[in-house]
């Protein structure tokens, strides 16, 4: 892959939602992905159009925008999913896989899954000093 280090830097800077969705897949599948599997899934999702990436500008803040979160999760699990945006007050029910959207200032946002201890960043100002401003709730279609 050309500019591999820049790609990884961009994933680290902008890829929190992608990585949270893959964490949902890990929880559902009952196994952790290794780095090569994560990279392969991310590149496949970009090629399929589920995730945006600008190969002409690795610092584009729209990189790793998830157009189709349900399809990304399907790619990683082999199952079909729905996803809904919910308010922070939403109480999850059995079968829900929840991703939290955090913000400390109302502008910068970060996705994490603190309910199961997952945060793609070692330290996140949004999580440390912010609050949950939204949820993404995934459910498997049976």
Q: Which residues does each PLM region occupy?
A:
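Flexible propeptides and autoinhibitory/regulatory segments associated with cysteine proteases
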Residues: 1-12, 126-130, 139-142
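Soluble non-cytosolic domains of exported or imported proteins
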Residues: 10-11, 15, 19, 32-33
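Stable alpha-helical structural segments in soluble proteins, enriched in small hydrophobic residues
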Residues: 20-24
């Amino acid at each position: 892959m050309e500019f591999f280090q820049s790609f990884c830097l961009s994933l680290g800077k902008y890829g929190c939602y992608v990585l949270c969705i893959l964490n949902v897949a890990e929880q559902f599948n009952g196994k952790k992905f290794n780095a090569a599997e994560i990279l392969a899934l991310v590149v496949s999702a970009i090629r399929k159009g589920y995730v945006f990436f600008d190969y002409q500008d690795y610092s584009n803040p729209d990189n790793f925008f998830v157009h189709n979160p349900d399809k990304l999760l399907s790619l990683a699990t082999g199952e079909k999913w729905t996803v809904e945006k919910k308010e922070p007050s939403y109480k999850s029910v059995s079968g829900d896989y929840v991703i939290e959207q955090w913000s400390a200032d109302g502008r910068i946002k970060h996705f994490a899954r603190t309910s199961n201890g997952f945060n793609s960043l070692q330290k996140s100002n949004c999580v440390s000093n912010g609050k949950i401003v939204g949820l993404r709730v995934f459910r498997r279609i049976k």
